[in-house]
């Protein structure tokens, strides 16, 4: 695993075995392959698999799963984020929120890119997914969460809140979990303090999703680009 996710597997596995619901988001869905197969696949129905999954920044217009209770009350979701895709899923994964990456909505390719990711262009991707485990308990994973500002997008926040309630084994209210429009001050509460280097998080705007698309690189082009950047730093 990574420095963030590298221990506590047995403790969490024991909780899941007791029927505990579990939601993991963004970097938390990226364990090592061994832990991903042994724990994440049965826990939440999928994981970011090194050498297979990718982590570009792109504009996703996320569509919730029609008629599923997690979709209740969910409005428009249009956000730019480091939405991982080409996730390694369990065969019984439920696609709770999906979007399609392509050449027009790519902001830029990040550090992890692969042939599988390159070939996923134009294919619908479950960015939010869930699983119903044997015995009836549930788990879910979400690849978004890099840009904190996106929590101020009502539909985005609503979908995740609904999913948390669903994963806990509760019925999602007909109009969705009760929530309200977030202010900029609220968006900045309880964040780490980096002193003078702390940046205030701004509310999302149309400018955040307006950009000239980046290049959908082949794996070789990506390797060459990264090598060029390294040479420039020397």
Regions found by a protein language model. Give the residues of each.
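Residue-level detector of secondary-structure boundary/capping sites
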Residues: 3, 61, 151-155
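Short linear interaction motif-like sites in intrinsically disordered regions of transcription factors
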Residues: 10, 41-44, 59, 114, ...
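Short, flexible coil/turn micro-motifs enriched in small/turn-prone residues
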Residues: 14-16, 40, 140, 164
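An acidic, glycine-rich "communication" segment
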Residues: 24-109, 117, 176-233
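A glycine-centered loop/beta-turn motif at secondary-structure junctions
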Residues: 73-76, 80-172
């Amino acid at each position: 695993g990574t420095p963030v996710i590298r221990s506590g597997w047995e403790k969490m596995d024991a909780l899941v075995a007791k029927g505990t619901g579990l939601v993991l988001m963004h970097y938390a869905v990226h364990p090592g392959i061994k832990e991903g197969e042994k724990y994440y696949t049965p826990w939440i129905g999928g994981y970011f698999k090194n050498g297979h999954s990718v982590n570009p920044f792109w504009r996703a217009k996320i569509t919730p799963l029609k008629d599923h209770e997690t979709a209740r009350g969910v409005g428009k979701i249009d956000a730019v984020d480091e939405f991982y895709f080409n996730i390694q899923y369990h065969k019984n994964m439920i696609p709770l929120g999906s979007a399609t990456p392509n050449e027009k909505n790519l902001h830029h390719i990040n550090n992890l890119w692969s042939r599988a990711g390159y070939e996923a262009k134009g294919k619908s991707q479950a960015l939010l997914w869930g699983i119903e485990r044997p015995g009836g308990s549930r788990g879910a994973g979400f690849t978004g969460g890099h840009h904190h500002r996106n929590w101020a997008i009502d539909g985005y926040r609503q979908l995740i809140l609904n999913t948390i309630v669903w994963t806990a084994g509760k019925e999602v209210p007909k109009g969705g979990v009760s929530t309200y429009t977030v202010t900029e001050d609220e968006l900045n509460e309880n964040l780490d303090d980096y002193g003078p280097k702390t940046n205030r998080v701004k509310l999302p705007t149309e400018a955040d999703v307006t950009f000239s698309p980046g290049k959908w690189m082949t794996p070789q082009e990506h390797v060459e680009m990264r090598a060029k950047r390294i040479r420039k730093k020397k």
